[in-house]
């Protein structure tokens, strides 16, 4: 199978699963969930659905459990909306890349603040008006 077809299918599944989660899944334990990506196996029979979940760690775990309980329903809805010989088995995975990116941004900001403080100290120590 061509890589281009697989990429298009992954994007289409991402859109459809996002729509199902927003409009069809009524479980209150599934909080604010965003589908960040879908990774299909080569034979299109397995899909890892990466999700980002807003909230505290405990709420994220509850949402992930709610998604796991709703997997059968989501898969059946997916089968109604996409024409494939086999609807892929779905596994939800928590996408930690957003949290990792936030952590890196915080570290970079701290480094920049440290550099700004050093620059200000250098300017104060090298004030030409003191001569």
Curated annotation (Swiss-Prot):
It comes from the Bacteria. Its main location: cytoplasm. Belongs to the RbfA family. This is Ribosome-binding factor A. HAMAP family: RbfA. The keyword Transmembrane helix does not apply. Monomer. Binds 30S ribosomal subunits, but not 50S ribosomal subunits or 70S ribosomes. GO terms for cellular component: cytosol. The keyword Cytoplasm applies. It comes from Natranaerobius thermophilus (strain ATCC BAA-1301 / DSM 18059 / JW/NM-WN-LF). One of its GO terms (biological process) is maturation of SSU-rRNA. InterPro entries: KH_dom-like_a/b, RbfA, RbfA_dom_sf, Ribosome-bd_factorA_CS. Residues 115-131 have a biased composition (Acidic residues). One of its GO terms (molecular function) is ribosomal small subunit binding. The gene is rbfA.
């Amino acid at each position: 199978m061509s890589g281009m077809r697989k990429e298009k299918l992954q994007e289409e599944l991402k859109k459809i699963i996002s729509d199902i989660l927003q409009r069809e899944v009524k479980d209150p334990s599934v909080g604010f969930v965003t589908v960040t990506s879908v990774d299909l196996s080569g034979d299109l029979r397995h899909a890892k659905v990466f999700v980002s979940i807003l909230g505290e760690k405990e709420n994220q775990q509850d949402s992930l459990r709610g998604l796991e309980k709703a997997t059968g329903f989501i898969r059946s809805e997916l089968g109604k909306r996409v024409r494939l010989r086999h609807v892929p088995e779905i596994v939800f995975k928590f996408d930690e890349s957003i949290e990792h990116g936030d952590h890196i941004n915080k570290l970079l900001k701290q480094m920049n603040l440290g550099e700004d403080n050093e620059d200000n100290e250098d300017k104060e120590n090298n004030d030409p008006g003191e001569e």
